[in-house]
């Protein structure tokens, strides 16, 4: 390890965004970069990280997960657990490996406020393409990247339950799409996953480890940052605790990449946030930015589970007696049930005709099991994960004290608006309608969860309150926006904290609003784009491409109803 005490850039957090920055910023050989990760290393021999199907094991395990929990959610009457990666790669080392860009119209929404124009889809698309190596796309696909560090597997969704689910979508009046990250997101089809040759493709494995051979990159794990140092409003360095000792390093710039929980926490501890709130915690305000920790978004989801009449599901793979054989197949050949995350297909649909683009995402699984490993009591089963994708419920994060080791108070306010409740009722009814189509008849052995007793709107909402889980997509807690927006925290042109010098934010907290899918891909894109901004490089040229828009494009544009891909 380097013993230098001064760096051009100190990156707080070796997660998704921090891994991208650690790689891109060290492409400038004259810049010294230090990445500080509070968790441990993502060892290549660690099966719970590297084996795709082991994704359920790290959550709730203190060796992999910081194990956050919300306060009692006021509209659910209970606390909600939140897993956050406690290893190099952050949550990309323990997540579900699902790669979803979000809808192009998400980014058009980002760009609506004055000053945010450079974050529209045309400006973001080239950065998505720069990070991707899309094995499921043709070399001439103008929407997808082909040479990036993130290797993406398409589907394959060959289990017959996937085909029946896709066909059920068509019977219910929807369309199939070959690539939900391409021209047409809306519809049913295979998903991309960050799995290559049977192994997880985390941000650290794709970006950070290849860069570690560079002499100008230093990565320190188990390094918990406790303080950012300032000279007036200029960040000058950080203090971190490692192996029981405190260390201080100087920094030309400090970049916060701690994620949607830790970035606003460190900002508040540094005196950046709502001035009155900070004073109440005994912290002298440095910069009054009331948006720090506010505008907090997340996706809530439920599982609709069915018994499967035919022995085609993956339910038997959950049998403890089979696990040694499944593990051996993976260890020696990187094949078998352990070589996939099994989120190989799903859908994006609109729950009503008033929304402009899909507000529901379905993850379909040919197995009935909860994220924590609790399996349904059936020999064979399948399930669909569903939830609203752009709810208008907003939460907040607030520190409890000046102690950097004390976890902050978190409330997402799930189900806090009438619109949110209505979308939830629509989500369950849409999902049930699809799962009741004739295409599912050969397999449909009846609904296990929530079960036939849950029918009315209020019964549905009661079940969601009891059973809903986070989809693990926290974002927007230090959002980008123009200085004219009193709730914005980060300058979208520089990624600097408003009013501060040499202090930037690059992670999910900077998203101005969440996207309509899993957020790992948008975070990688944001970090790629931010790296060029920080380096002072000319940004990649915007790419203005046509994409499917409901009510504007032909209804069948981009649909793949008879594509041979689906003829398993």
UniProtKB/Swiss-Prot annotation:
| Superkingdom of this protein's organism | Bacteria
Q: Catalytic residues per the record?
A: 473
Q: What EC number(s) would the UniProt record show?
A: 1.1.99.1, 1.2.1.8
Recorded catalytic activity of this chain's protein: choline + A = betaine aldehyde + AH2; betaine aldehyde + NAD(+) + H2O = glycine betaine + NADH + 2 H(+)
An example GO BP is: glycine betaine biosynthetic process from choline
Pathway-wise, it operates in: Amine and polyamine biosynthesis; betaine biosynthesis via choline pathway; betaine aldehyde from choline (cytochrome c reductase route): step 1/1
So which cofactors does this thing need?
Answer: FAD
The UniProt keywords, alphabetically, are: FAD, Flavoprotein, NAD, Oxidoreductase
What terms describe the molecular function in GO for this protein? betaine-aldehyde dehydrogenase (NAD+) activity; choline dehydrogenase activity; flavin adenine dinucleotide binding
Which InterPro entries does the UniProt record give? BetA, FAD/NAD-bd_sf, GMC_OxRdtase, GMC_OxRdtase_N, GMC_OxRtase_C
| Binding sites annotated in the UniProt record for FAD | 8-37
Which EC class is this protein assigned? oxidoreductase
Q: Does the keyword Aminoacyl-tRNA synthetase apply?
A: no
What is its biological role? Involved in the biosynthesis of the osmoprotectant glycine betaine. Catalyzes the oxidation of choline to betaine aldehyde and betaine aldehyde to glycine betaine at the same rate.
**Name of the protein described by the UniProt record:** Oxygen-dependent choline dehydrogenase
Q: Gene of origin?
A: betA
């Amino acid at each position: 390890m380097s013993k230098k005490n001064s760096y051009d850039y100190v990156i707080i957090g070796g997660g998704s965004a921090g891994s991208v920055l650690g790689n891109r910023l060290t492409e400038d050989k004259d810049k010294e970069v230090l990445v500080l990760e509070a968790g441990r290393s993502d060892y290549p021999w660690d099966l719970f990280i590297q084996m795709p199907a082991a994704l359920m094991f790290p959550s709730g395990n203190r060796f992999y997960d910081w194990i956050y929990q919300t306060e009692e959610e006021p509209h659910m009457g209970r606390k909600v657990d939140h897993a956050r990666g406690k290893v190099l790669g952050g949550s990309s080392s323990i997540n579900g490996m699902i790669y979803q860009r979000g809808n192009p119209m998400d980014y058009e929404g980002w760009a609506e406020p004055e000053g945010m124009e450079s974050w529209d889809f045309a400006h973001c698309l080239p950065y998505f393409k720069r990070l991707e190596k899309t094995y499921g796309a043709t070399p001439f696909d103008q929407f997808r990247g082909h040479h990036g560090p993130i290797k993406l597997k398409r589907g394959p969704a060959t289990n017959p339950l996937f085909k029946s689910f896709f066909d059920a979508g068509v019977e219910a009046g929807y369309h199939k799409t070959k690539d939900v990250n391409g021209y047409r997101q809306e519809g049913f089809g295979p998903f991309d996953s960050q799995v290559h040759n049977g192994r997880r493709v985390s941000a650290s494995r794709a970006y950070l480890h290849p860069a570690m051979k560079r002499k100008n990159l230093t990565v320190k794990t188990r390094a918990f940052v406790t303080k950012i140092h300032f000279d007036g409003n200029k960040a000058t360095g950080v203090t971190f605790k490692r192996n029981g000792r405190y260390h201080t390093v100087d920094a030309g710039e400090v970049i916060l990449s701690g994620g949607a929980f830790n970035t606003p926490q460190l900002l508040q501890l540094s005196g950046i946030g709502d001035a009155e709130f900070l004073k109440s915690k005994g912290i002298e305000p440095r910069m009054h930015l009331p948006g720090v920790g506010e505008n907090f978004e997340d996706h809530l989801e439920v599982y609709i589970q069915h018994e499967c009449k035919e022995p085609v599901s993956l339910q038997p793979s959950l049998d403890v007696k089979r696990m040694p054989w499944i593990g051996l197949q993976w260890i020696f050949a990187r094949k078998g049930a352990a070589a996939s995350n099994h989120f190989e297909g799903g859908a994006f649909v609109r729950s009503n005709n008033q929304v402009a683009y899909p507000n529901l995402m379905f993850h379909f699984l040919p197995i009935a099991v909860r994220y924590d490993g609790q399996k349904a009591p059936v020999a064979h089963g399948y399930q669909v994960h569903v939830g609203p994708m752009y709810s208008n419920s907003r939460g907040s994060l607030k520190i409890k004290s000046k102690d950097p080791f004390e976890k902050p108070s978190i409330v997402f306010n799930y189900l806090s608006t009438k619109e949110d409740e209505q979308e939830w009722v629509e989500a369950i009814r849409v999902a049930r309608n699809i799962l009741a189509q004739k295409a599912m008849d050969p397999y449909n052995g009846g609904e296990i969860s929530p079960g036939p007793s849950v029918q009315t709107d209020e019964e549905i909402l009661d079940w969601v309150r009891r059973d809903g889980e986070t989809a693990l997509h926290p974002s927007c807690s230090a959002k980008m926006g123009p200085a004219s927006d009193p709730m914005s925290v980060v300058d979208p042109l520089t990624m600097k904290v408003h009013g501060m010098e040499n202090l930037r934010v690059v992670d999910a907290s900077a998203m101005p609003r969440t996207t309509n899918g899993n957020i790992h891909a948008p975070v990688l894109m944001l970090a790629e784009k931010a790296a060029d901004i920080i380096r002072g490089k000319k940004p990649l040229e915007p790419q203005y491409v046509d994409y499917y828009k409901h009510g504007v494009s032909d209804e069948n544009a981009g649909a793949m109803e008879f594509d041979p891909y689906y003829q398993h």
